Regions:
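Hot-dog-fold acyl-thioester-processing enzymes
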Residues: 1-56, 112-136
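HotDog/MaoC-like acyl-thioester-processing domains
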Residues: 5, 69-70, 80-136
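Short, well-ordered turn and helix-capping elements at secondary-structure junctions
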Residues: 12-14, 60-66, 97
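Hydrophobic beta-strand-centered segment that forms part of the acyl-chain substrate-binding groove
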Residues: 37-88, 104, 108-110
Length: 136
């Protein structure tokens, strides 16, 4: 089902006084994974923007399951679905040492072309199709 994986490591400064990754940092991990995923699929935000195309996050749902701590390596995974005009990046992060689920997230994104909400973007439709093919 997941069509992309990225391994990362927790840095000390990402943790709060409790010694765990601060909740806001997980959004950075999720965003970095999406950007690396798009880049791996030859999709550039800069090039899209130059064409008048902007992909924007409209909402994020995150369920926190197991905390990550300084030095933990983790695997961030994703696949893409679509609901109406929204592209849904379904993302999870697993702690590498024991494969425990750290977070589960749904990132809803929309595409705006020349300032107007678009119903689709061919580059993203291809990613949805690849996700669906992997699920079958």
């Amino acid at each position: 089902m997941y069509i992309y994986e990225l391994e990362l490591k927790v840095r000390d400064y990402e943790c709060d006084i409790q010694g765990v990754v601060n909740n806001s940092v997980y959004q950075n991990y999720l965003e970095h994974t999406r950007h690396e995923f798009l880049e791996a699929n030859n999709i550039s935000f800069a090039q899209l923007h130059d064409r008048g195309v902007d992909a924007m996050v409209s909402s994020i749902e995150i369920a926190y399951k197991t905390p990550l701590r300084p030095g933990d390596s983790f695997i961030s995974k994703l696949y893409v679905t679509k609901e109406g005009v929204r592209y849904i990046f379904n993302q999870v992060i697993y702690r590498k040492s024991d494969n425990k689920l750290a977070i589960k997230a749904k990132v809803h994104a929309v595409v705006v072309i020349d300032g107007k909400l678009a119903s689709s973007l061919p580059e993203f439709e291809e990613l949805v199709a690849r996700s669906q093919a992997k699920a079958e």
